[in-house]
Curated annotation (Swiss-Prot):
Disulfide bonds: none annotated. The lineage of its organism: Bacteria, Pseudomonadati, Pseudomonadota, Gammaproteobacteria, Enterobacterales. It catalyses: A + NH4(+) + H2O = hydroxylamine + AH2 + H(+). This is Hydroxylamine reductase. Catalyzes the reduction of hydroxylamine to form NH(3) and H(2)O.
Length: 550
């Protein structure tokens, strides 16, 4: 096992990465190794997808499957070894079908990629795990060095984050052939074990630029189906009655659940990154969507244990449900998996609803505590002139984007302390689950404009980018000249690709933490600092002083 993709990875003087029987996330060595094997199979599939496009062949089954299967290897998504192997087998079957299509056009069709003809050696998980050793990401570290390995992983993990957003967009009916062609090209190239530093740096920026397009179609999918988010108050306390909790990012799953629970007497609560759903008109119209439950994903083993109903995980993040003894009432959807947990293959939530009706639910309603969400792209753009007016009248000094992933590390209190230290004449724009560090606090307003503005899920960084570009255009300056600072927390691969997206768009002087990714070497950090001004957090006082004086 070697895995260094998330922020909680093991760090020692000898090197970074989880390399024992189990990773810090709870992923076993077996599952981790089989995920490496799956990635190799997906690289071979992408290699043939690139070749097929040379012949004018676009196989939508391949395009739909590849990012989804890659998403299953993201942190805290799928811990179920047999399902990972199932994805690998499906990848190879699709590859062979695509290969046959190519050969029907050109009998000499050939794909020159190390992964192009990969076959699984056995049905036995132990044998497959031994085969997976050929594809361990750091297998040639001694030959290529830490810097090249770090750049490879930056590209692989960044592309993995983009694949997750591609799957979210696909679920909502969005497709862009150029994006998929670019995805397959990059995925196939990474399967050649590239070792050119400049080429890898260019690839990282290409992934960021591609992801900007992905976030654009995801935004289109969400707003076309569910309307543009508008500011909405959400209760974060319990309401009397039977209940279901839904977590993750999949708004379509939430919509289906709301439709199927309507009139059943079962209330629905959002959790984690599903909180922004309350801002969408077509979702909040359901009166039994009564609130949001819990805090950051890392607290779920305590909070889920206390929730008196079933729980549905639609995407990341799931952690060991046996710890809180709620494994008999947590359900996984789509690419999510945990051994022994009930999995929903389709869109029928009937078994979940039946379980909710058999459980006690909340015995009484607590005193409501309301927070505000729903500052989506359209709403944010509607504030642009107000923001400019406040700045011109010196009522608004600075905007801080404080957001990103949450996690268990104690150093993440930095982001709570930073938000509460922001001066009263400054605004906080937030997104993703990092907001749970401070989103239940009171920040007041500036002439009626809330000082805490919740833009949505992690992918809604797109909305923040569009706002920044719009402000810069209206003010006749560059984005980096705005009174705007980005203070980002990271945990997993979606955050990595958001960072690459920002860097590829030329956004500079981003402050990130609580620690640097374990695959970043001192040399790579120095390169990113020199090119983009990217740096790690220090202390709240020092960072605040520096950002306000920039």
């Amino acid at each position: 096992m070697f895995c260094v993709q998330c922020e909680q990875t093991i760090r020692t003087p000898a090197g970074n990465g989880c390399s024992y029987a189990q990773g810090m996330c709870g992923k076993t060595a077996e599952t981790s190794d089989l995920q490496d094997l799956l990635i190799a199979a997906l690289q071979g599939l992408s290699a043939w997808a690139v070749k097929a496009r040379e012949y004018g062949i676009i196989n939508h089954d391949v395009d739909n499957f590849a990012p989804r299967a890659f998403f299953s290897t993201l942190t805290n998504v799928n811990f179920d070894s047999p399902r990972i192997v199932g994805y690998a087998r499906e990848a190879i079957a699709l590859r062979e079908a695509l290969k046959a299509q190519c050969l029907s056009v050109d009998a000499n069709a050939h794909c020159d990629n190390p992964m192009a003809d990969l076959q699984l050696v056995s049905d036995d998980l132990g044998e497959l795990q031994r085969q997976a050793a050929e594809f361990t990401p750091n297998k040639d570290k001694a030959a290529i060095g830490e810097n090249i390995l770090g750049l490879r992983l930056l590209c692989l993990y960044g592309l993995k984050g983009a694949a997750a957003y591609m799957e979210h967009a696909h679920v909502l009916g969005q497709y862009d052939n150029d994006i998929y062609a670019q995805y397959h090209k990059i995925m196939a190239w990474l399967g050649t074990w590239p070792a050119d530093m400049n080429a890898l740096l260019e690839c990282a920026m290409e992934i960021g630029q591609m992801n900007f397009k992905v976030m654009s179609i995801l935004d289109a999918g969400e707003t076309t189906k569910y309307g543009h988010p508008t500011p909405t108050q959400v209760n974060v306390k319990a309401t009397e009655g039977k209940c279901i909790l839904i977590s993750g990012h999949d708004l379509k799953d939430l919509y289906n659940l709301l439709e199927q629970t309507e009139g059943t007497g079962v209330n629905v609560y959002t959790h984690g990154e599903m909180l922004p759903a309350h801002g969408y008109p077509e979702l909040r119209k359901f009166k039994h969507l009564v609130g949001n439950y819990g805090s950051g994903w890392q607290n779920q083993q305590v909070e889920f244990a206390r929730f008196p109903g079933p729980i549905v995980m639609t995407s990341n993040c799931i952690i060991d449900p046996t710890v809180g003894s709620y494994d008999d009432r947590i359900w996984t959807r789509s690419i999510v998996g945990w051994p022994g947990v009930s999995h929903l293959e389709g869109d029928d939530f009937g078994p979940v609803i039946a379980q909710a009706q058999q459980m006690a639910g909340f015995p009484y309603s607590e005193i409501p505590h309301l927070i505000t969400v729903g500052f989506g792209r359209q709403t944010l753009l509607g504030t642009a002139d107000t923001l400019i007016d406040l700045v011109s009248r010196e009522k608004l000094r600075h905007i801080f984007l404080v957001g990103g992933c949450d996690g268990a590390r104690g150093e993440r209190n930095y982001f709570t302390d930073f938000a509460t230290s922001v001066p009263d004449d400054c605004l906080i724009l937030t997104l993703a689950c990092g907001k749970y560090r401070f989103n239940k606090l009171e920040f007041g307003d500036i002439e009626g404009l809330p000082r805490l503005v919740d833009a949505g899920q992690c992918n809604d960084a797109y909305s923040a980018i569009i706002l920044a570009v719009t402000l810069a255009e209206k003010l006749g300056c560059g984005v980096n000249d705005l009174p705007l600072s980005l203070v980002l927390s990271w945990f997993e691969q979606k955050a990595i690709v958001i960072l690459l997206t920002l860097l590829s768009l030329g956004v500079k002087n981003i402050v990130t933490g609580p620690t640097a990714p374990g695959f970043f070497t001192p040399d790579l950090l120095a390169i990113l600092n020199e090119k983009f001004g990217l740096r790690s957090v220090t202390t709240v006082e020092e960072d605040m002083k520096q950002l306000l004086s920039a």
